[in-house]
Amino acid sequence: MERGETPEEERQSGCVLPTSPESDSLKTSNWGFLITGVIGGALVTVYAVTTPFIAPALRKVCLPFVPATSRQVENVVKMLQHRRGPLVDIGSGDGRIVIAAAKAGFPAVGYELNPWLVWYSRYRAWREGVHGSAKFYISDLWKVTFAQYSNVVIFGVPQMMPQLEKKLEFELEDGARVIACRFPFPHWTPDHTTGEGIDTVWAYDMSACRTQGKRA
C-alpha cells in the first residue's frame, strides 16, 4: 500500500494544493477593500482640491478666479501713481495685483475666499521678496470692512457691482480711490479710464462719487 504524500512533499514536488472557496473569497474581499480605499481616497482628494473653486460659483453673487493680464496689472499700477496709504485687492486671486502694489511701495492686502489661492499668493510674495508688505487672508468680501483702506482694487462681475458699490460708498473715506477692472460700477462716474477691452481700468474718487449720488 502506497503512502500518501504530505503537504510539504507536494509543495517540494511542484504540486499545488487546490484552494478552498473560503480562501478565494477572502482574497477577493481583500482586493475589494483595497480598490474601495483607493477610489475613496481619490474622491476625497478631488473634493478637497476642487471645492474651494466650485463653492464660490454656488453663491448668489460669485467672484470667479480669472487671472489678471500683465497689461491689467500695469494699468492698475498706473492709476495708483501719486497715491499713498494702504491698498486692498477684493478677491485677490493669485496675488499678482497685491504683489505689484507692494513692489510700488504700498502696504497691500488681498482678501480671497479660495484657500489654495491664498497659500499660493503667500508663497509668491515670499519668493518675490515682498512678504513683509503683501498680506493675504481667507475671507468672504461681504464679511470684511474696508474702511481702513485708501485704495481699493476690484476685479468684479456685473451682477455684484451694484451691491459692492453701496458697500464701498458706505464704508470708505472721502479720500479713498476705487479701481475697477473688467467691469465698471453701474452708477459712479470714473474720473480716469485707461486700457482697452478686457484690460480697461476705471478709477473712481470716493468724494466725487458721493457728491454725484447726492445730486441724483
Curated annotation (Swiss-Prot):
<keyword id="KW-1133">Transmembrane helix</keyword>
<comment type="function">
    <text>Mitochondrial protein-lysine N-methyltransferase that trimethylates ATP synthase subunit C, ATP5MC1 and ATP5MC2. Trimethylation is required for proper incorporation of the C subunit into the ATP synthase complex and mitochondrial respiration. Promotes chronic pain. Involved in persistent inflammatory and neuropathic pain: methyltransferase activity in the mitochondria of sensory neurons promotes chronic pain via a pathway that depends on the production of reactive oxygen species (ROS) and on the engagement of spinal cord microglia.</text>
</comment>
<keyword id="KW-0949">S-adenosyl-L-methionine</keyword>
<dbReference type="InterPro" id="IPR029063">
    <property type="entry name" value="SAM-dependent_MTases_sf"/>
</dbReference>
<keyword id="KW-0007">Acetylation</keyword>
<feature type="transmembrane region" description="Helical">
    <location>
        <begin position="31"/>
        <end position="50"/>
    </location>
</feature>
<dbReference type="GO" id="GO:0030061">
    <property type="term" value="C:mitochondrial crista"/>
</dbReference>
<feature type="region of interest" description="Disordered">
    <location>
        <begin position="1"/>
        <end position="25"/>
    </location>
</feature>
<dbReference type="GO" id="GO:0018023">
    <property type="term" value="P:peptidyl-lysine trimethylation"/>
</dbReference>
<keyword id="KW-0472">Membrane</keyword>
<feature type="modified residue" description="N-acetylmethionine">
    <location>
        <position position="1"/>
    </location>
</feature>
<dbReference type="GO" id="GO:0016279">
    <property type="term" value="F:protein-lysine N-methyltransferase activity"/>
</dbReference>
<keyword id="KW-0812">Transmembrane</keyword>
<feature type="compositionally biased region" description="Basic and acidic residues">
    <location>
        <begin position="1"/>
        <end position="12"/>
    </location>
</feature>
<dbReference type="GO" id="GO:1905706">
    <property type="term" value="P:regulation of mitochondrial ATP synthesis coupled proton transport"/>
</dbReference>
<dbReference type="GO" id="GO:1904058">
    <property type="term" value="P:positive regulation of sensory perception of pain"/>
</dbReference>
<keyword id="KW-0496">Mitochondrion</keyword>
<feature type="region of interest" description="Required for mitochondrial location">
    <location>
        <begin position="51"/>
        <end position="85"/>
    </location>
</feature>
<dbReference type="InterPro" id="IPR026170">
    <property type="entry name" value="FAM173A/B"/>
</dbReference>
<dbReference type="GO" id="GO:0005739">
    <property type="term" value="C:mitochondrion"/>
</dbReference>
<comment type="similarity">
    <text>Belongs to the ANT/ATPSC lysine N-methyltransferase family.</text>
</comment>
<keyword id="KW-0489">Methyltransferase</keyword>
<protein>
    <recommendedName>
        <fullName>ATP synthase subunit C lysine N-methyltransferase</fullName>
        <ecNumber>2.1.1.-</ecNumber>
    </recommendedName>
</protein>
<dbReference type="GO" id="GO:1905273">
    <property type="term" value="P:positive regulation of proton-transporting ATP synthase activity, rotational mechanism"/>
</dbReference>
<keyword id="KW-0808">Transferase</keyword>
